Amino acid sequence: IDEILQRIINFEPKQSKKIKIESVLKDQDIFELIEPSTDINDIIMPENTKELLENILKQQDKKVLERLHSWGIKSNKNIEAKIIFYGPAGTGKTMSALAMAKSMKKSVLSFDCSKILSKWVGESEQNVRKIFDTYKNIVQTCKQSPILLLNEADQFLSTRVDGSSGSDKMHNQMQNIFLEQIERFSGVIIATTNFLESLDSAFSRRFDYKIEFKKPDFKDRLKIWEKFLPKKALFEKDF
């Protein structure tokens, strides 16, 4: 009896072995896994843009979400956000997405949306589903939810075309599937695009945040030069 009691007292439940995300990703060629190292304070951007990003992070803070859930305001306590970063190329959209991931202590699964199109009938639409199905499978297998980063998502987000050609129908069908997947998505998704002007209104309604990234002004350009030029480099006078 003493032995049985001792076993009960000292019983430790077996820890379920956590599957590493790297091992799951070995069997697929869709996503690039990124472990972010950039801090949001390392990025030179307009102050109002930084404030917007910091506000999103505060709203998505785990303690805040748990409190809202306990009050019955939020149905679950998971971090969920659908975000669009838009603006000219080279303005820090991807880098800011990685910085936000670091602040949320999340890995990033990055996908280059320019690879989605296929010359084969129906394959582009299947590829859209495959992105989200694979992401969902990774989340369920690894018991963690990395941020899904869709780079250059212009063809997903642009206004649907009113045409009867095969390519027009394929484009619209692909976007309809994307809309459906966005509607169901659970987690954090960030899509980057250079062209917000052509954004379909249906997509605009389904994203929680739309953040503009502008070209740096003179003050920010000066900060960039000062950050990356060697401190002890010899320059001509008044450089």
Q: What feature does the model see in each segment?
A:
Residues 1-64, 79-80:
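AAA+ P-loop ATPase mechanoenzymes
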Residues 43-238:
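Walker A/P-loop NTP-binding motif of AAA+ ATPase domains
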